[in-house]
Amino acid sequence: LLRQTAYTEDDVAYLPDHGEITLESSALALIALADCAETSGNTGYIPACEALGAGILSLLDTGTGSFTHVLDASDLGRKEAVRSAEWDGMGVTALCRLYGLTQDPLWLWAAELVLDRMIEEDPAQYGDVWTACALREVTKYAQDRTDYFVFALKHAQVNMASVYGAQGTDPAGLEMLLVSCETYGAMLDAGYSADGFASELLQEIIAVRAQRQLDGYLFPEYAMYFAEPQKVLGAFMVREDGLNISASGMCRNIGGYSLYAVYCDKLAAEKPSEYEGA
């Protein structure tokens, strides 16, 4: 990843992707390096993270809070203003992770600038896990911004029905709701009220979705029908996408079920066993 990162003369870094510079690739690279830095404690990753952060800032119009999503890698000219709404959430998440590493207020300021613009728009269009991640990350540091918490709950609530009704095995919905659940818990811990939020419905949908998503898990009984069962055993597939198995889908499933395990442990700790005291 570090070898593929391209630097300008001003120590601004991007991750080129098939002749393009995209907000997506640079944000994901920064998040991955931030994970490495936090997990290993190796501060040697921070300069690369800061350079990628500067690259993300170069895509940001500070007057409007909007990102340019795609540049031409050959001359850094603007190629596409918006390619995917979820990329905004990726950019905000990356900037917040960088703030967590460096405590440089520039990164948090930029993240809030983008979120302020997103809040003014229709939250229903951001029905994705990256928006949920962005709100979870920013509320770790901007707990005085009640509007961010409100936006997080609205984002979850307007997307509950679509996640519940989804019959396929796409993993994004489960992770989105679990991340939103974390933000909801942080909101309560910060002393804010969440009156009107359908928390019990959220818990019900999370449980249903976690069970339904297992239809895409390749148990031995499913894997045996593939040409090379040993290569797919224990993987996740997306049934509605031609039984496709992808690295991104695997990451989403692992991320979602990891959060679900933590969520279930927390629920168990909060609810006394029916046998307690028997």
Where are these predicted regions, by residue range?
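Well-ordered alpha-helical scaffold segments within catalytic/enzyme domains
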Residues: A27-T43, M90-D104, W130-D144, E175-G196, ...
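CBM-like carbohydrate-recognition segments
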Residues: G165-A278
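A charged, solvent-exposed segment within the mature domains of Sec-exported extracytoplasmic proteins
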Residues: S25-G63
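Structural signature of alpha-solenoid helical repeat scaffolds
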Residues: I21, G41, K79, R83, ...
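Long, well-ordered core segments of solenoidal/helical folds
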Residues: L1-D11, P47-S66, G100-A124, A142-Q167, ...
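A structural signal for alpha-helical segments
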Residues: G44, K79, L106, D147, ...
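Carbohydrate-binding/catalytic loop surfaces
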Residues: T8-I31, G65-M90, T131-T146, A156, ...
